[in-house]
């Protein structure tokens, strides 16, 4: 299978499973990713997702150009229908407010980096390499790279990476805020799982509302963002979890949240 979908408790791990092709996204993988993200989004028992790549070499090298070119390139607008949901389903058009963790086990290039940019927190192996290299092949980032990267790192650095098509190391990615942590390769998935465990101990509805507030707020004036934050905060007050949290605090015990 081009994709592995595994669930342990409330944590889903989605693994790009084409290590022989640096986990590049071919049409089959693209379709399976759309199905996987839809399944994760709609499953009430799935609270956090981890996305990673099989093998030790690559998270993902992006679109498999050999297999994607016939349907995505060659004439103006050729790739529009193919990209309605964006590469892998999450780069455009699918809103997922549940948190997603990227466990970057190697190269994250072109569309692979764009997939990573859709994740909320990112841990990278020490040998990982990052880049939006599309201009080398006379194409441009088309799965959100030109929009998300400048929102995460200094604009000058985003310009450098995109216009020159150059790569950067894991250490540089951490320095500029592109990843949250850099760890030895053997610790990438354990770190992602530890983070997922921490998030699962928090109020799941509150976590989702907070993520939604952050993402939507990035494109809003501050006053509008504050109104949206107040609205989302208000929607939590009538939930069972919002009763359980303060009650557990008062009783000096660990809360038991049910996403209700």
Task: Name what the model sees in each region.
Residues 30-42, 65-105, 137, 152, ...:
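An acidic, glycine-rich surface segment that forms the CoA-thioester-binding/catalytic face
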């Amino acid at each position: 299978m081009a994709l592995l979908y595994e669930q342990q408790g409330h944590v889903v791990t989605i693994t790009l499973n084409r290590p022989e092709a640096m986990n590049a996204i071919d049409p089959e993988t693209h379709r399976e990713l759309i199905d996987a993200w839809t399944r994760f989004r709609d499953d009430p028992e799935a609270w956090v997702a981890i996305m990673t790549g099989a093998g030790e070499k690559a998270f993902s090298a992006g679109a498999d150009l050999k297999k994607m070119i016939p349907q995505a390139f060659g004439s103006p607008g050729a790739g529009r229908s193919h990209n309605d949901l964006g590469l892998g389903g999450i780069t455009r058009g699918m809103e997922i407010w549940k948190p997603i963790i990227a466990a970057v086990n190697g190269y994250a290039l072109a569309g692979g980096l764009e997939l990573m940019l859709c994740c909320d927190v990112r841990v990278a192996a020490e040998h990982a390499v990052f880049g939006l290299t599309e201009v080398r092949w006379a194409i441009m980032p088309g799965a959100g790279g030109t929009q998300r990267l400048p929102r995460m790192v200094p604009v000058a650095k985003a310009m450098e990476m995109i216009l020159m098509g150059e790569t950067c190391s894991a250490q540089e990615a951490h320095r500029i805020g592109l990843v949250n942590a850099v760890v030895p390769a053997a610790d990438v998935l354990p770190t992602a799982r530890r983070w997922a465990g921490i998030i699962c101990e928090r109020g799941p509805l509150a976590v989702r509302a907070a993520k939604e507030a952050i993402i939507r707020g990035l494109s809003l004036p501050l006053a509008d963002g504050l109104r949206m934050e107040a609205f989302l905060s208000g929607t939590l007050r009538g939930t069972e979890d919002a009763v359980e949290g303060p009650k557990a605090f008062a009783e000096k015990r660990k809360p038991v949240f049910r996403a209700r």
